[in-house]
Amino acid sequence: PFGPQSYEHSQSSDIGIVAKMFPDMNFLVYHSSFVGGNQEQEFVDGSGRDGIDTLIQSLVDNEVGPNANVFAELGSTWRFLMRDPDNAAHALGKLLKYCGEDNVLWGTDSIWYGSPQDQIQAFRTFQISEEFRDRYGYTEITSELRRKVFGLNASVPYGIDDVEIQ
């Protein structure tokens, strides 16, 4: 969301509804419904939390499973999350768990922030702690998963042949 103007129209509470109605159409959620200033936590069904949890609640309520037709893009999101490992772990952990490991896409919004090199380096070394993986069911960020997020996952929503990416 960008500022208070029409804030309710920038929420993702309707994504699950339309994703279920149109299963052959892909939905790309820029910024992954992230709201700056929110402290990310474990998703709790029905909690009514804003931001990423709004997107996840919509998917859960409408039975849109992981790796379906909803893609979460990390532009601007990772830039703010990378400074706080626990916040980053919850945000990425939830997106990978509920949107799916094949449906989280890299983005930097570097047009606003300049070189994305710090974001790239931070993501290349970031790991969700074993404690968070055990406690919340988050996945380990492997080299293969990084490759998928950094580019391979974009093949479906952008209609690019996997061979072209290799």
What is each of the regions a protein language model found here?
Residues 109:
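Active-site glycine-centered loops adjacent to acidic/histidine catalytic or metal-binding residues
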